[in-house]
Swiss-Prot record:
InterPro entries: MMgT. Residues 1-3, 64-132 are cytoplasmic. Coiled coil: none annotated. Component of the ER membrane protein complex (EMC). It holds the Pfam family MMgT. Its main location: endoplasmic reticulum. This is ER membrane protein complex subunit 5. Signal peptide: none annotated. The keyword Signal does not apply. GO terms for cellular component: early endosome; early endosome membrane; EMC complex; endoplasmic reticulum membrane; Golgi apparatus; Golgi membrane; membrane. The gene is mmgt1.
Length: 132
């Protein structure tokens, strides 16, 4: 219930800001027509703009909820050292280490092996006999 009151207050503030902007634009066009371009805005438009801005900001602050502490220790108390700098979205598994750290036997097989090569089948049979 309270949230809808603050949302209504923000809506009223934004509507009042839009009305003040429209009034300022209308006043400016009137000043152009009367050739009095050096005059400032009337005080009622200025006050409406300031009051609407304050009302909208006040409603937004109450909708946003509780503020967090500026000191990060209150948020870091419930985290362990392992999860502190752990960012799983930055893990990369497709890198050159897969090729660099292969056993030498399997590395040769992958380099030399061709689809219809009799030489590659000979090497494979030699490797299989070595592993038995």
């Amino acid at each position: 219930m309270a949230s809808s009151i603050w949302k209504g207050l923000v809506g009223i503030g934004l509507f009042a800001l839009a009305h003040a902007a429209f009034s300022a634009a209308q006043h400016r066009s009137y000043m152009r027509l009367t050739e009095k371009e050096d005059e400032t805005l009337p005080i009622d438009i200025v006050l409406q703009t300031l009051l609407a801005f304050i009302v909208a900001c006040y409603g937004i602050v109450h909708i946003a909820g509780e503020f967090k502490d500026m000191d990060a220790t209150s948020e870091l108390r419930n985290k362990t050292f392992d999860t502190l700098r752990n960012h799983p979205s930055f893990y990369v598994f497709n890198h050159r280490g897969r090729v660099m750290f292969q056993p030498p036997e399997s590395e040769d097989c992958h380099r030399i092996q061709a689809p219809f090569s009799s030489n590659s089948s000979l090497k494979l049979s030699k490797l299989e006999s070595m592993h038995r």
